[in-house]
Design a protein with these regions (language model features):
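Alpha-helical transmembrane segments in multi-pass membrane proteins
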Residues: 22-75, 241-246
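Membrane-interface helix/loop boundary segments of multi-pass membrane proteins
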Residues: 147-174, 201-208
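Hydrophobic residues within alpha-helical transmembrane segments
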Residues: 23, 143, 174-178, 214, ...
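Structural signal for the C-terminal ends of transmembrane alpha-helices
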Residues: 70-79, 202-205, 253-262
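Short, Lys/Arg-rich, polar N-terminal cytosolic tail immediately upstream
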Residues: 1-12
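C-terminal membrane module of polytopic membrane proteins
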Residues: 217-267
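Alpha-helical transmembrane segments
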Residues: 13-29, 93-104
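Juxtamembrane helix-loop-helix connectors linking adjacent transmembrane helices
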Residues: 39-53, 79-147, 158, 162, ...
Length: 267
């Protein structure tokens, strides 16, 4: 079972992963932004920062940065996209149970976010800019979740498990906290860390990043594609309805968790 093949189990490895990941993600958008501003100035334009970020080149450059991160992490074997402890015959079943796990997680998390008011520094306008166009949609819904799983559950969790093989839960908690912090938004820090616990446990239990990637992609895709009308339905639900739906969702969640726990009990 391995989530990463080249780590030596050192803190310096984790720092290197974070630095490389950050540089790869930031470099293409920064370079493109500079080029856009230079071209604009040469033509006598006066584009402000908002206008620069609204150009179609920016979402494409962010997608490029995320793809570069995936390529580098896989090329360097800092993270491994293998089956781990999952048998080939069980792949489809595992993926389906990962979807069930996400379904059980999604609504309780949404309701908890409403109960626990944590500041959200990402405005609707900024979210629209990040997810605009086909490139933004693909990046946010699919490519970014894959890159984050390679970083946090592959490289970082893989390193931490080598550093503390007898304390996997400590490794899972630390990787979850890092996952929350890198989002740089209070609400995503808090709930991202909780989400990271679930994804970290899933990766550790199965020895594979594939189930956590399925859950992560399902989550981001749902957030991206859920119509505003559906969100209003959730917001306007009565307390009794919320409690009942949350209860049913938790039953689904724990059923999926129990399935994974029994299926991959012995490590």
């Amino acid at each position: 079972m391995t989530l990463s093949e080249t780590t030596n189990g050192r803190l310096s490895d984790i720092i290197r992963y974070l630095m490389v990941y950050g540089v790869l993600l930031v470099s293409p958008p920064v370079i493109v932004a500079i080029c856009v501003v230079v071209v604009d100035r040469l033509h006598g334009g006066t584009m402000d920062s908002d206008s620069v970020w609204q150009t179609p080149f920016m979402t494409a450059s962010m997608l490029l940065g995320t793809v570069l991160a995936i390529v580098v992490f896989l090329w360097r074997r800092w993270a491994v996209l293998g089956l781990g402890r999952i048998r080939r015959a069980d792949v489809l079943k595992v993926f389906l149970m990962a979807i069930v796990l996400f379904i059980g997680w999604y609504l309780p998390e949404e309701l908890l976010q409403r109960l626990v008011e944590v500041p959200d520094n990402l405005s609707d306008k900024e979210f629209e800019q990040l997810t605009s166009g086909l490139a933004g949609l693909i990046d946010t819904a699919v490519v970014a979740p894959i890159s984050e799983e390679l970083l946090c559950r592959g490289a970082i969790l893989g390193t931490l498990l080598k550093m503390m093989p007898r304390r996997p839960w400590v490794a899972i908690v630390i990787s979850a906290l890092i996952f929350g912090v890198i989002h740089l938004n209070p609400v995503q820090m808090v709930f991202g860390a909780l989400y990271g616990l679930l994804l970290g446990w899933l990766a550790w239990r199965t020895g594979s990043l594939l189930p956590s990637i399925v859950v992560h992609v399902a989550n981001n895709t749902t957030v991206m594609l859920m119509p505003a009308s559906a969100e209003k339905v959730i917001v306007n639900m009565s307390l009794i309805t919320e409690v009942l739906l949350a209860g049913v969702s938790l039953i689904v969640l724990f059923t999926a968790l129990r399935w994974f726990n029994l299926r991959y009990k012995y490590i």
